[in-house]
Structure formats: C-alpha cells, structure tokens
C-alpha cells in the first residue's frame, strides 16, 4: 500500500509539467505552493485515486485555456465536486506521472521559493516563470493547492490586487471588485487566489482546473504534514517573515471555516476544504505570495495571466498619473471657484456701498421747494394742526416689532427703534389721560419707558405711503441733528402703516401755552427775550450749520417748547417734509396757525429759509404784543396779527414809542433798547419781499448784542478816529510799498511823519 501512495506523489510532480500554462501566473505563487502541491498529492494518494489522476493531467493542460475564456462557468461546477468527491479528482490529475519527481519537488521548491520572493519585489518575474517550468513541475503540485489559498487572499488583496486575480480570466478585468463575482460563480477557487496573494496568479491560470484543484484542497489537510516535510521549510519560512504576519494570522483563522465567509458568502463550502490544506502548508509560503501578489494581480486584470507582474507596475503608474491629474484638476477648479466667489463678494460690497451713499443723500431735499399741488395756500400755517383725511395705506402686510438697536447718544448715532407694543405699554394704551396735544401730524402722548425715562410719543398721520426705507432715511437725518436749542429725537417705530416718533419729554409746555392760555400769569420781558434768542439760535443752526440744511416749514409758538428754566427748544423740524413727501392731505381748518404763513408760499408754493424767517417774525410779534397770530375776537380787519402790526412797527421805529405794541401784561416792565431791537427784528422778518428779509444768523447777532456792553464806549460812529485820515492813508501806502518792495523807504521818515501827525492832533 505504501508503494501506490508513493506513485501518486510522483505523478503529482509530473502533473505540474502538464500544467505549465498556469505557470505564467505561477512565478510568484510557485514558491508558496510547491509545498502545498506536494502535500496535496500525498493526501490524494491516501484517497486511493491514482488511476484517475492519470486522466486528469491531460485535463489539467486544457483547463488553463478555458479559464481565460470563461473561468466563472468552470469554477462554478467544481464547487459541487469540492463538496462531494474533491479528493478523487485532485489525486487523479497531478500524481499519475510524477513517480520520479518527488525528489525534484523537494529540490525545485527552493528555487521556486526564491523565484517567488523576487517577483513581489520586481516586475520581471514573468520571464523567470517561463524558464522555471522545469522546476515548476515540482511546484506544479502547488496549483492544486493554490485554489485553496485563494479563498484566504481576498481579505488581504481586496485593497490592491485581489480583484485582479479573479479578473484575469474574464471577470477580474472589468472591475477590481470582481472578487464578489468569482465568489458566487466558483467555489472560491478564483476569489481566494487574491487573498493568498501568490496563489492568486496561478489560480487565475488554474481556474480551468479549479474543479480538480478545488477538490484537491479538501484532501490536502491530512496529507499536508507530509508535504511540509518534502518542500523546503526554510523557503516557506522565508515568506513568512516578510509580510506574512497579517496573512499568517489570517491563515490560522482560515484553517477554521471563517476565512471563506470573509471571501464571500457563496463559496463557504469549497473554501473550508482548501482552508485546511492552506492552513497546513501554504501559511508559510503564502506570506511571500501575499507580498508578491499585490503587484501581480492588477497586471493580470489588465492583460492576463502571462503579464501579471509587468502589467502591475504600469497600472500603478497610470493610477498615480491619473491621481495626479485629478488632484491638479481639483486644485484648479477650487481656485477658479474661489476667484469667482471673491469677485461676487466684491460686487456685492460695491453695490451695498453705493446703496448706502444713495440713502445718505435722500435727506438732502429739505431745501427743495414744495410743489403747489401738494398743499393748499393755507397749508404752511397748519402743518402741525392738520388732519389727514386720506386713507392710511400700509405697505406691510404683517406687524413688525422693532427692538432698540442703539443707545441715544452723540452726533451721528442712529436712534432707538421701538416696538409698537412697547410704546402701547409706555403710553398706557395711548389713553386720553396721557394725551399732551394734537397737531397737524397727529397726537402727542406722554409715555414712560421701562427704564423710567419719560418721553413724548407722536403718532404721525402720514400713514405708510412713503415706505419704510424712505421714512427711516428721513428720521435718521433728523435724529442726527443736535443743538442745545433743538429738541432731540429719542427713536421711532414702524408697524404696518403706523409711524411714531419718540422725543424727550419737555415738562414746561410750549410758548403758545404761556402766552395765550387763560389763567396763566404770562411771561416777563427778560424771559421773552431769552426765549426769542434761543429759538433764533436753533433755527439758524438748521438753516446754516446743519448738513444737509433743514427748512423747518412750520415755525410757530406751539413748536417752541420750554424747559423748567424757560430754555427754548425748537421741535418738529423736518416733519413737514415727511408729510409733504407722503402727500398728506391738509384740511382747510387753519385757525390759530394761518397767520404764520409767508406770502410768497401762498402765491408760488415755494418754501425757502426766508419762509421760516417770516414765521419767526410772527413769533416775535407774539412775544412783543401778546396777541395770537389770528384772533377772531378782534375787530374786523384786525384778525391778522401781521397786518395789524405793520403800521405800528413803522411808527415805533420812527418815534420809539412802544406803548401801542407792548403786551398789556407787561405794562412798562421792559427795556426800551431791547424792545426797540426786537421790534426792528420783527419788522425786518415780516417784509413782503423774501430777498429783503434778514438771515437767521443776522437775527441771532442782533439778539446777542442786547446782552453785550456798548463797545463804542459812548462814542458815536466817526468820533473814535484820533488820527488824520489823510496821514493814515499815506502811511498805509507806505506800508504797501514796503511790503511789495517797489521802493525803499526808511523807517525814520515813517516815524517822523507819525510824530508830526500826533503833534498836530494834540
């Protein structure tokens, strides 16, 4: 019985020669599998199938070709054979002829192992495999064992090459992920080669034989110990040290059936058989094959089993070049996108800056004349005592709540933005108890903010026709105006079609109240002069020192608020423009305010700074006379204060008799000079010709002179000259000549002439 066993072993060695075609891919795997093949034949003889092996050698030669054409179909049938009679087919194919080769396999494996080790390092191994066939006959037994190793390789090769080994015949070429395909079709003979790394190339060639090879793996487990002794263990050990550690760890796992599941779920049945065989011998040889396999499989996928090693480097270079190109393309695209984004951001920033500039110039139209159609002839005098009959049209469909955005503060800061609900709470629901008064633009309510600050809330009747943006621009311009004689704005509110302005609360009411309210003690002369001077300063600031210039358009005594010390504050400046821009309809009821309107406004509809000057002249007449601008209680023809005062003003300037004009409440408790100056100022302000009216700055200087001491020291104009004018003119000419250097004059002549002039004057 022992002799027949030996015979099959020899036949196994010969079978490799017949299976030379697979050797093309075997260069890397041969070293790893000679031992495996030897072991497999030993197990096969144990099965007692030597006669069948003789028949299989012939079959083994054609199978390598068939795998190229259609490896998947052939591997699929072997799977059943593996499960059923794997040992019979395997011993039949390799062992019949190689009775002499047993010694050779032992010798050949060493060369095969060295050959296998170099191929992983360099691509040239393909030629050596062709030369190695003589030696490979010994290693050829490895191919039967190769199919078993493949099941293990998929885990290691899946990253670089595993797909290539199954792909080389037909499936590995299309995609690197072909292993799944082979796993379903063959019993894992094709797919496992990639995991085994080295066995994978031979497996690609053997795919035709895998039925028999796959069957071999099942019997090898018992025979493997013998084969390990035959192939040089040192060669097998060499591969193990290099990178086999991971593969070896996998090998122990492979002896157990888990490795096949790793390869694929379909081939677990065939895989268990190869796994035991692989665990016995290949573990040592497989590590080198694993090292070699990574380069070889990709090449097999590209060309075939013949060009596995050389093709691998090329695909690697192609991948590197393609990856470099892709990286460059990505970098270029990213740079282009970044540039596009930067340009878009720049365009947006420029647009925003331009829009801000446009908004900043919106408030510059305060000086523009108001069209005649926008108001009736009597509208100027009733700007703050008008009622809007037009429907309130809102350009917002939903309530908007605004919270305070900035603190009230210095010049250039934005006002606070209040919510409507906040103002409702502050004014106690805009109750009548908090009502301070009603003007042409709406009612004014007293309110207390959460920080206990007292404010005056003005509900504008202008509605929402202007639009939020325009209204905000106007309010922002008004809120930037700060002067000690101007009422500062605290904030505003926009809610649907509601427009509200919030001002500092002034507790001492207004000038109209103190002059004309019943039961009031009236104002003394000093207080009246103080109020007139303060209002003049505030109005002059709006006309000349404010940018953009603001025309109040509604100067009257009710818009001059008084603090507790009777410090005058001009209020409601700029609101007339808001109303006119919103096309607010002005009612015809102008009683009490009609007398402030300038005559040119009624005739031409134009408003200028001189229109405010005329209105301020009417306020001065109120302070002087204590009468209302329009008083229906006066006799017919004397209802208008301006028309009644004109003849009296001219008479007072000529005769300096002020009794007819002075307020009866004053009696004679006034300073004559100050009364005269105030009468002159009032007469100049109410002139019919707008061009002949003084500027507000001139009126301010006139009031300032009332408080200053006489700079003339009691001397009349012309009496202060103590030097001869002729002599003085001569000295001036001399200085001019000296300055321009036209002629040379000595200083002696200048001093001599000056002394002479002094002596003459004495």
UniProtKB/Swiss-Prot annotation:
One of its GO terms (cellular component) is plasma membrane. Residues 350-762 are cytoplasmic. It is a single-pass membrane protein. Residues 430-706 form the Protein kinase domain. The chain crosses the membrane at residues 329-349. GO terms for molecular function: ATP binding; protein kinase binding; protein serine kinase activity; protein serine/threonine kinase activity. Residues 1-328 are extracellular. The keyword Endoplasmic reticulum does not apply. The active site is at residue 554. It holds the Pfam family PK_Tyr_Ser-Thr. Its EC number is 2.7.11.1. ATP binds at residues 436-444, 458. Residues 1-322, 370-410 are annotated as: Disordered. InterPro entries: Kinase-like_dom_sf (IPR011009), PERK1-13-like (IPR047117), Prot_kinase_dom (IPR000719), Protein_kinase_ATP_BS (IPR017441), Ser-Thr/Tyr_kinase_cat_dom (IPR001245), Ser/Thr_kinase_AS (IPR008271). It is found in: Cell membrane. Residues 60-210, 231-246, 254-275 have a biased composition (Pro residues). Keywords: ATP-binding, Cell membrane, Glycoprotein, Kinase, Membrane, Nucleotide-binding, Serine/threonine-protein kinase, Transferase, Transmembrane, Transmembrane helix. It catalyses: L-seryl-[protein] + ATP = O-phospho-L-seryl-[protein] + ADP + H(+); L-threonyl-[protein] + ATP = O-phospho-L-threonyl-[protein] + ADP + H(+). Interacts with KIPK1 and KIPK2 (via its cytosolic domain). PANTHER family: NON-SPECIFIC SERINE_THREONINE PROTEIN KINASE, PROLINE-RICH RECEPTOR-LIKE PROTEIN KINASE PERK4. Belongs to the protein kinase superfamily. Ser/Thr protein kinase family. Could be involved in the negative regulation of root growth. This is Proline-rich receptor-like protein kinase PERK10. The gene is PERK10.
